[in-house]
């Protein structure tokens, strides 16, 4: 029994301590959960706001770049038109245009990236605007084969060798060569003592002492010292908390029988008056009394509940035509895309 009681007390104490610790943990985790919810809400809101802004910026940048490219292409075409007009004198001569194209083709191997794109734009311009053929025989030769038929390859014979190309860029520096053999010994130079006159021997007084040097590094650690004497015993600690109350002890042995009591017949003094007793039960009902007088008439009672709704009445006559409303607000062009204009406008 005693062991069971102790176990019950220990279990109760542990349960109480666990409940207290759980409540403390819950209270400590409440602010952490609140902060986490706030930060997650802010992060999601910022993402919902920034993603559409980024997409709008990318679309605007793409449209601007496309406009710049179209403007550059248009300006390049205009420049090529002006150059062709200057070289041909404003006349659409097929022979001159063919010579210009051949001259540009000869520089194909030496063209840079800029020349390549310029040639492409020039060819496209020639395709877009075909020239007239006033004299179709100019610059055109017919080549016949040995059998007398037309040439089927549609190519002319190879032309003469072109001019020499431009000089190439300088090559990379070569690796350094090996070390050569040592050269012959150099002739002896003049004696340095002969350049200066002899000096008289003299002794100067010693100078002042220099400043103290910086402290040297720390020395190695010394050997361990001897063990110290044992300390004095400490003072007596405070009294500990009271322990868990023990289980109730076993009942004691029954005591010996007591001595027989004495019976006294003397009458003692009269005691104090007792408290009043409880009230008795109710009596039987009495006879019926005479009838009372008639009461006065009552006042008007409250109003009753409203009745059901009646049938709908007939439609009224049509009203007069109302006055015309005010003019609406003028429309805006916020929903329209930006106009495609060249840069600088």
Swiss-Prot record:
Region listing for Triple-helical region, in residue ranges: 156-185, 207-263, 268-333
A single GO molecular function term of this UniProt record: structural constituent of cuticle
Keyword check for Repeat: yes
Pro residues bias spans: 179-191, 198-223, 278-290
Keywords of the record: Collagen, Cuticle, Disulfide bond, Repeat
Domain of life: Eukaryota
Key word Transmembrane helix present: no
One biological process term in Gene Ontology: collagen and cuticulin-based cuticle development
Region (Disordered): 161-345
Gene Ontology cellular component terms for the protein in this record: collagen trimer; extracellular region
Compositional bias annotation for Gly residues: 292-304
Family statement drawn from the similarity comment of this UniProt entry: Belongs to the cuticular collagen family.
PANTHER family in the cross-refs: COLLAGEN, CUTICLE COLLAGEN 14
Subunit and interaction comment: Collagen polypeptide chains are complexed within the cuticle by disulfide bonds and other types of covalent cross-links.
Function: Nematode cuticles are composed largely of collagen-like proteins. The cuticle functions both as an exoskeleton and as a barrier to protect the worm from its environment.
Protein's recorded name: Cuticle collagen 14
Native source organism of the sequence: Caenorhabditis elegans
Encoding gene per record: col-14
